[in-house]
C-alpha cells in the first residue's frame, strides 16, 4: 500500500473573518490566507464577487467542517444603486443594455421598499454561478447565450435607505437570507421604478454569527506575519533557520465553535469527552441538559468536540473534531 504524503502546513483550526478588498476573487483570498497562516487546509463560507469588498469568512483546518452552518447564516450588505442604466451583469462590469433619463425621488424609492421585504421571488443574474444543465450561467452568458434562470424565493429581513448622495445614486443596507442576489435587487427595483439601475458599490458587513467587529484586513494580517527564513543565492534556506513565531497571527483566529452559535451546546466531562472522541454516544447529565435536539454540539474544556444529535437525553456524535 502506498503511503499517504505528509500534509504541508500547520494543523491550525479556526476562522479568519477576512475583510476582502475590491479586485480580489474569493478563491484568491482563500489561497492568500492559507499561505499567510501556513495552514494545511482552508475554505470560504460564501463567494464574494471580485468587485465587492467586505466579509469573507475563511475556515482553517477543522473549521472547514462547520462551513455549511456559516453559509446558512443571515447576511448584511451595504450597496449603492446607480439609476438610469441596466447592465448585462447588473453591476459596473457589464455593458449597458437599457437606459433611462428618469431618476427616482427618495419618496418613490421609500414607497417601493415594502415590496422587497419578507419572502420575495427573485431571478438570479445572467452572470451568476447558478448551474443550467450542468453549466454555470456565467459561462453560458460569456458565450453570448441568454439563459432562462428560474425564479426562486429568498427572504429579505430588512431593506432601508442609508444615503441619497445625488439624483443618480441611492445607498441601501439589506439583511437577507442565503442565496439572495443583491445585483438582482438593484435590477428589479430599477425596473419597478421605471428608470433601470445597477450595482455600483457592494460591501458585505455581516455573515451570521460574525459581525464587522470580527473582520481583519490584509494589512493587519501582513503586519504580524512572521517572515520566511532567509535564503542564499541558490534559494536554499540558510541554516540554522530561526523558528517562525505565528503567535501574533494566530491571535486573530476565532475558535471553530463560534460558527455553531445556532446550535445547542452542552459541556462534557473528561470521561464523556473520551467516549465521544471514539465515536460513542453519551448520556447527558445535568438539570439543563436537553432531552431532544435534531442538531447539537458538545464541548470539552471550552473547546468544540463534536456535532451530533440528542435522542432521549443521549448525545450521538456525527462529526468529531480533533481541534477546537
From Swiss-Prot:
GO terms for molecular function: RNA binding; tRNA pseudouridine(55) synthase activity. Residues 87-107 are annotated as: Disordered. Disulfide bonds: none annotated. Its EC number is 5.4.99.25. It comes from the Bacteria. One of its GO terms (biological process) is mRNA pseudouridine synthesis. The keyword tRNA processing applies. The active site is at residue 49. Pfam families: TruB-C_2, TruB_C_2, TruB_N. Keywords: Isomerase, tRNA processing. It catalyses: uridine(55) in tRNA = pseudouridine(55) in tRNA. Responsible for synthesis of pseudouridine from uracil-55 in the psi GC loop of transfer RNAs. Belongs to the pseudouridine synthase TruB family. Type 1 subfamily. This is tRNA pseudouridine synthase B. It comes from Brucella abortus (strain 2308).
Amino acid at each position: 500500500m502506498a503511503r499517504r504524503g505528509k500534509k504541508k502546513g500547520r494543523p491550525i483550526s479556526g476562522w479568519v473573518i477576512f475583510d476582502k478588498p475590491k479586485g480580489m476573487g474569493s478563491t484568491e483570498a482563500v489561497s492568500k490566507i492559507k499561505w499567510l497562516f501556513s495552514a494545511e487546509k482552508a475554505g470560504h463560507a460564501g463567494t464574494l464577487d471580485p468587485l465587492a469588498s467586505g466579509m469573507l469568512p475563511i475556515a482553517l483546518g477543522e473549521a472547514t467542517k462547520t462551513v455549511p452552518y456559516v453559509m446558512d447564516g443571515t447576511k448584511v450588505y451595504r450597496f449603492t444603486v446607480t439609476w438610469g442604466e441596466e447592465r448585462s451583469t447588473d453591476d459596473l462590469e457589464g455593458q449597458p443594455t437599457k437606459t433611462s433619463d428618469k431618476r427616482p425621488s427618495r419618496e418613490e424609492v421609500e414607497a417601493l421598499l415594502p415590496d422587497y421585504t419578507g419572502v420575495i421571488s427573485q431571478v438570479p443574474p445572467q452572470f451568476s454561478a447558478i448551474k443550467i444543465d450542468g453549466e454555470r450561467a456565467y459561462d453560458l452568458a460569456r458565450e453570448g447565450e441568454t439563459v432562462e434562470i428560474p425564479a426562486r424565493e429568498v427572504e429579505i429581513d430588512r431593506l432601508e435607505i442609508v444615503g441619497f448622495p445625488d439624483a443618480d445614486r441611492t445607498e441601501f443596507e439589506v439583511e437577507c437570507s442565503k442565496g439572495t442576489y443583491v445585483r438582482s435587487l438593484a435590477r428589479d427595483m430599477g425596473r419597478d421604478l421605471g428608470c433601470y439601475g445597477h450595482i455600483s458599490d457592494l460591501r458585505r458587513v455581516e455573515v451570521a454569527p460574525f459581525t464587522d467587529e470580527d473582520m481583519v484586513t490584509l494589512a493587519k494580517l501582513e503586519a504580524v506575519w512572521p517572515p520566511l527564513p532567509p535564503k542564499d543565492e541558490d534559494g536554499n534556506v540558510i541554516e540554522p533557520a530561526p523558528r517562525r513565531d505565528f503567535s501574533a497571527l494566530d491571535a486573530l483566529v476565532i475558535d471553530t465553535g463560534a460558527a455553531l452559535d445556532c446550535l445547542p451546546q452542552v459541556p462534557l466531562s473528561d470521561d464523556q469527552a473520551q467516549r465521544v472522541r471514539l465515536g460513542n454516544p453519551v448520556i447527558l447529565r445535568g438539570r439543563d441538559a436537553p432531552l431532544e435536539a435534531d442538531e447539537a454540539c458538545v464541548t470539552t474544556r471550552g473547546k468544540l468536540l463534536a456535532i451530533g444529535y440528542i435522542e432521549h437525553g443521549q448525545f450521538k456524535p456525527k462529526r468529531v473534531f480533533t481541534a477546537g
